[in-house]
Amino acid sequence: MPELPEVETVRRGLADRLVDFQIGQVEVCRERAIASPGGSALFIKMLCGMHVGSWLRRGKYLMASLHHEIAQSSADSEPDPDGGWWGVHLRMTGQFQWHEAISSPCPHTRVRIWNKKNEELRFVDTRSFGQMWWVPPGNAPETIITGLQKLGPEPFSSAFNSSYLSKRLKGSKRPIKSALLDQSIVAGAGNIYTDESLFAARIRPHTPSGQLKKVELERLCNCLTEVLRVSIGAGGTTFSDFRDLEGINGNYGGQAWVYRRGGQACRICSTPIRRESLCGRGTHWCPNCQR
């Protein structure tokens, strides 16, 4: 599943490509891709004619403001979305493609959106778990996209710090990796970046969360945000399905310290990286560097 860096990469691509984008036509190729009340019929009706404003990311969710007229943003904000919100979750294999010329859709195309110039934004999803929502104007996105209600703080926010983690993890016996994967504790982290950040922080993924000291939690917070920052700069990670809006792979995978490097020598100490299942997730770690 695309994690925070991959979703942020997509957000930036959409923000760049969809400047002054007015939706002229929408085609839903698979009904289950639309998760909001009213299904595809209402989704199509309410998006057609709308101007797409700012793209936001919350955890692994994407949201675009919709406007009846072109949104004239100030330095600090843009007008309220009088057309509501357009929400997206890529899930396992969802990806956006940009097509300037007319082309036939592949079998896994789920939603097609054209502007007035007949340029197409295409949503392709092999596993068909990706979802879209239309949120009516005047409603907070989380009232319709209910998964937003459960999200913890963003890793880059001031709310995510060692004091916060210490309170949330106090007395917990579950492995720290499992805690980091919990979206109600920190939004956006997934299997790749939990492995990478725990390695950077020199913490074993099996360590009971509640046993970590304040200094270790502070180091973990710093390492997680730094790993995410580096991956965003590399355009995310591609091991299978992820591509950005232009079809380009993410480049972080080649820089990974432990993820998908089971059996290979640790880049720091040359100890073979271990791969095992922890809490049902493939987990990579160095038994020498992480104690």
UniProtKB/Swiss-Prot annotation:
Note accompanying the cofactor annotation: Binds 1 zinc ion per subunit.
Stored InterPro entries: DNA_glyclase/AP_lyase_DNA-bd (IPR015886), DNA_glyclase_Znf_dom_DNA_BS (IPR015887), Formamido-pyr_DNA_Glyclase (IPR020629), FPG_cat (IPR012319), MutM-like_N-ter (IPR035937), Ribosomal_uS13-like_H2TH (IPR010979), Znf_DNA_glyclase/AP_lyase (IPR000214), Znf_FPG/IleRS (IPR010663)
Source species, domain of life: Bacteria
Reactions the enzyme catalyzes: Hydrolysis of DNA containing ring-opened 7-methylguanine residues, releasing 2,6-diamino-4-hydroxy-5-(N-methyl)formamidopyrimidine; 2'-deoxyribonucleotide-(2'-deoxyribose 5'-phosphate)-2'-deoxyribonucleotide-DNA = a 3'-end 2'-deoxyribonucleotide-(2,3-dehydro-2,3-deoxyribose 5'-phosphate)-DNA + a 5'-end 5'-phospho-2'-deoxyribonucleoside-DNA + H(+)
Residue positions binding DNA: H108, R127
Disulfide bonds: none
PROSITE patterns per UniProt: FPG_CAT, ZF_FPG_1, ZF_FPG_2
Annotated zinc fingers (FPG-type), start-end: 257-291
Transit peptide found in the keyword field: no
Secretion signal span: none
Recorded GO MF terms: 8-oxo-7,8-dihydroguanine DNA N-glycosylase activity; class I DNA-(apurinic or apyrimidinic site) endonuclease activity; damaged DNA binding; zinc ion binding
Cofactor(s) the protein requires to work: Zn(2+)
Sorted UniProt keywords: DNA damage, DNA repair, DNA-binding, Glycosidase, Hydrolase, Lyase, Metal-binding, Multifunctional enzyme, Zinc, Zinc-finger
GO biological process: base-excision repair
Active-site annotation: P2, E3, K60, R281
Pfam family, one: zf-FPG_IleRS
Documented EC number(s): 3.2.2.23, 4.2.99.18
Known role: Involved in base excision repair of DNA damaged by oxidation or by mutagenic agents. Acts as a DNA glycosylase that recognizes and removes damaged bases. Has a preference for oxidized purines, such as 7,8-dihydro-8-oxoguanine (8-oxoG). Has AP (apurinic/apyrimidinic) lyase activity and introduces nicks in the DNA strand. Cleaves the DNA backbone by beta-delta elimination to generate a single-strand break at the site of the removed base with both 3'- and 5'-phosphates.
PANTHER family, per database record: FORMAMIDOPYRIMIDINE-DNA GLYCOSYLASE
Description of how the protein assembles with itself and partners: Monomer.
Similarity section: Belongs to the FPG family.
Name recorded for this polypeptide: Formamidopyrimidine-DNA glycosylase
